[in-house]
């Protein structure tokens, strides 16, 4: 299963594609289950105070993995089209996490369609283009003037009394 010496190149590529397709379907199912457990708060009877704690402590997920999956699951419960897009490989977990906070009833179909089959970076650009943040105004601030009496060099001697 983990040794590929006797596997032809074309066969290896086909196996990889099939595994990725299965992984996409499993990820969509996993998100659906996480979302339902989260909604029912079934982590509480398991001795966990949050879905995040349950994922990390009971399911042995990394913190990053737990965070991404929970947020994606919550977005997918609100907008079930996400499950379909993840299952067919049109949208990845990172993309769901970028899009999730931006989705609403009015824009979710259009945004999900535009994000389909795009990289995380391209989805970030899509989000930025649709909801640009105002530029941070340039600020100039006056720095406090150095005080000869307060300026301490080596040995705590004020600059005016120090020898060069």
Where are these regions (language model features)?
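Short helix-coil boundary/hinge micro-motifs
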Residues: 1-164
């Amino acid at each position: 299963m983990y040794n590929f010496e006797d596997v032809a190149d074309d066969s290896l590529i086909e196996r990889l594609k099939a595994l990725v397709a299965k992984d996409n379907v499993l990820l969509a199912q996993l998100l659906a289950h996480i979302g339902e457990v989260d909604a029912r708060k079934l982590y509480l009877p398991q001795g966990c105070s949050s879905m995040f704690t349950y994922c990390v402590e009971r399911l042995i997920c990394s913190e990053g993995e737990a965070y991404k999956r929970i947020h994606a699951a919550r977005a997918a419960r609100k907008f079930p089209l996400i499950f379909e897009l993840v299952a067919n490989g049109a949208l990845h977990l990172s993309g769901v996490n970028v899009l999730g906070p931006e989705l609403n009833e009015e824009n979710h179909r259009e945004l999900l369609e535009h994000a389909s089959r795009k990289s995380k970076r391209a989805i970030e650009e899509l989000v930025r283009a649709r909801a640009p943040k105002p530029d941070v105004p340039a600020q100039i601030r006056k720095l406090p003037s150095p005080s000869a009496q307060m300026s301490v060099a080596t040995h705590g001697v004020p600059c005016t009394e120090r020898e060069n």
